[in-house]
């Protein structure tokens, strides 16, 4: 069994984001970038399957992104993935998620992967399109928002548990298939220092647009999302401090809630 984990590098949710002057994106310089948290579940699930099952031949981690995205690949390798694929080219930066799915499908279609794992969504754009689109382009079944995964002993199918509106749905799927992970699937382990050092020696195959035959044809007419720009949220108005006696302050608070905040 060959497992592929598709990752994305995103800004750390605790960092301060700066938008480019032209509104075309975010400034990456000085911004802490991390593995998309939902993709962490996918990494850990792939590595756990490899540790548990003798029939897992390899776990490959794949990412689309600039040179900086190699850090996310190294994290996956330190956790336990065997090798990485880094799709990096300036032309890839302009692809929307559906076009990225078409790119990845071209690269992996002949890889013989039995199970493809990725996060159910990304925390920056939050669209969740890539996984389902990739499954469709590869013509394989897809299970989304998975919180439990158990592969059959013979390695031909698996049972997945997924969240659906306050309940859990249990489905059985024949491999090959694609699964998107949700919080609850498994928490990614912290890679140890020795494994971080070993990760530097694991192979990472970097591919540019020139290495992907048929890219223009595959992405032409695919996608439909046009990013018009990024804008910061409007500044919050300053808070008000109510002075005076408590009784008068309460009356003023009620008035403000009723007349200005329209909360009453």
Explain the meaning of each model-derived region.
Residues 1-264:
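N-terminal glycine-rich FAD/FM-binding segment characteristic of electron-transfer flavoproteins
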